[in-house]
């Protein structure tokens, strides 16, 4: 990943993501087909099996259609329902603030193509999310507990989909799904690395440290490559520290919460509030980022553990997202108005809806 990000840039990353998307949808369609085939293509039989699943290999089958199996008060305690709402807020709102998704809009030639790409992305992503229902319920009804245990006897939830593919399609399909999962990880991490390196090189190095002045030719690209290497090295170190037992889906939920808390307030208020200014943007970003990370560290999965956690929720979104919006609002109203920026707001709205006046895409 580091090699093709550092030397290939956005073009190499884009091609990896295109190939990954095609393979991912193909593998998901085939796996969904095999799950339905196992249940004789009968939704009635499929959901009946879900309602009497040998959940996790337990002696007493559980009805997976019942509410509250993970976040119910009886299972997760009094904070369970609120934790579910917090998780959903992060997942829904965080999608609009993911930096490696936003940066894709710089790779299209015009606003019309950007809107078209959003429609296609929504359709493809929606289809995939529907198919995950078959993955999860299919694994619960087909796999046995012994198949997903690690060497130390703990369930390896990250390997459920490949093991399900192995059970239904054999070793070749297992290898294919594993390769698709690996390509997906590479594509996502590459997108994040590109976003981080480009932001540091262009926004911080050029505009903050050098005040927007022209640097030596190629210097910004060199800084971006060094940043990409550093980000990749730090990410690898964190992954090794966390180990294979951490559920990747849980980490994704936390990342979405951070994006929703820090990036979303700035994006929404920039588009819909005429008075919103730079001070509000900085305040919203800083408070949203700090609040979300701090609450994660103070959560039951943080540094104090489940017993002594000062913050009772595992997902911080329900607290950190409003804090981000509040800080952005306060940062704006407590500072002087910017008449020049407000005068350009009408122009911004026209450009946002029509694309008139927007910059053309450049070769990457």
For the regions a language model picked out, list residue spans one by one.
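Loop-to-helix junctions at membrane interfaces in multi-pass transport proteins
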Residues: 22-175, 302-317, 346-363
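Loop-to-transmembrane helix boundary motifs in multi-pass membrane proteins
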Residues: 201-246
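Membrane-water interface regions at transmembrane-helix termini and the short interhelical loops
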Residues: 1-21, 103-110, 265-276
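Transmembrane helix-loop junctions in multi-pass membrane proteins
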Residues: 4-11, 135-146, 173, 231-252, ...
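Membrane-helix boundary/coupling elements in multi-pass transport proteins
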Residues: 93-94, 173-206
């Amino acid at each position: 990943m580091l090699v093709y990000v550092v030397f290939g840039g956005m073009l190499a990353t884009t091609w990896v993501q295109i190939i990954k998307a095609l393979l991912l949808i193909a593998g998901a369609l085939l796996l969904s087909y095999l799950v339905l085939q196992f249940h004789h293509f009968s939704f009635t039989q499929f959901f009946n099996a879900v309602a009497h699943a040998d959940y996790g290999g337990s002696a007493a089958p559980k009805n997976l259609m019942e509410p509250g199996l993970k976040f119910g008060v009886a299972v997760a305690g009094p904070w369970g329902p609120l934790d579910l709402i917090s998780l959903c807020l992060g997942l829904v709102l965080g999608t609009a603030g993911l930096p490696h998704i936003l940066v894709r809009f710089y790779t299209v030639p015009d606003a019309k193509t950007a809107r078209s790409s959003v429609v296609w992305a929504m359709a493809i992503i929606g289809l995939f999310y529907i198919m995950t229902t078959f993955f999860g319920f299919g694994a619960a009804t087909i796999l046995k507990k012994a198949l997903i245990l690690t060497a130390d006897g703990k369930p390896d939830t990250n390997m459920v989909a490949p093991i399900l593919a192995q059970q239904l399609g054999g070793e070749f399909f297992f290898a294919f799904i594993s390769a698709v999962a690996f390509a997906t990880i590479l594509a996502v991490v590459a997108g994040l690395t590109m976003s981080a390196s480009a932001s540091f090189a262009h926004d911080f190095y050029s505009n903050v440290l050098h005040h927007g002045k022209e640097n030596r030719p190629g210097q910004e690209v060199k800084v971006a490559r060094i940043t990409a290497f550093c980000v990749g090295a730090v990410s690898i170190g964190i992954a090794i520290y966390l180990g294979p037992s951490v559920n990747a889906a849980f980490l994704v939920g936390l990342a979405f919460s951070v994006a929703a808390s820090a990036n979303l307030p700035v994006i929404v208020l920039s588009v819909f509030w005429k008075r919103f200014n730079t001070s509000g943007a900085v305040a919203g970003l800083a408070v949203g980022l700090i609040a979300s990370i701090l609450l994660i560290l103070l959560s039951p999965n943080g540094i104090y553990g489940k017993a002594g956690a000062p913050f009772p929720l595992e997902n911080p979104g329900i607290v950190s997202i409003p804090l981000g919006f509040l800080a952005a609002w306060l940062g704006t109203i407590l500072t002087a108005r910017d008449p020049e920026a407000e005068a350009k707001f009408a122009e911004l709205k026209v450009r946002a809806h029509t694309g008139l006046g927007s910059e053309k895409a450049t070769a990457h």
